[in-house]
Amino acid sequence: MNWKVLEHFPLLLYILAAKTLILCLAFAGVKVYQRKRLEAKQQKVEAEKRKQAEKKES
């Protein structure tokens, strides 16, 4: 077995942990972006419904 590889094992674990953290934050950011975009779309639809309801009342 190559013992030199085991000397770098803690560094490899830190790199793996950092990569995992970066990916997790990236996915969380995408989810937040998608939710904001969806909320904006829903608000637009609700505003259009209100306008149509006001036109029917007039």
Curated annotation (Swiss-Prot):
* Assigned keywords, A-Z: Coiled coil, Membrane, Transmembrane, Transmembrane helix
| Compartments where found | Membrane
InterPro entries recorded: SMIM11 (IPR042125)
Q: Which GO terms describe its cellular component?
A: membrane
TM region(s), chain numbering:
9-29
**Its membrane topology:** Single-pass membrane protein
* UniProt superkingdom: Eukaryota
Q: Which residues form a coiled coil?
A: 29-58
Q: Which PANTHER family match?
A: SMALL INTEGRAL MEMBRANE PROTEIN 11, SMALL INTEGRAL MEMBRANE PROTEIN 11A
Q: What is this protein called?
A: Small integral membrane protein 11
Please spell out the taxonomic lineage of the organism that makes this protein: Eukaryota, Metazoa, Chordata, Craniata, Vertebrata
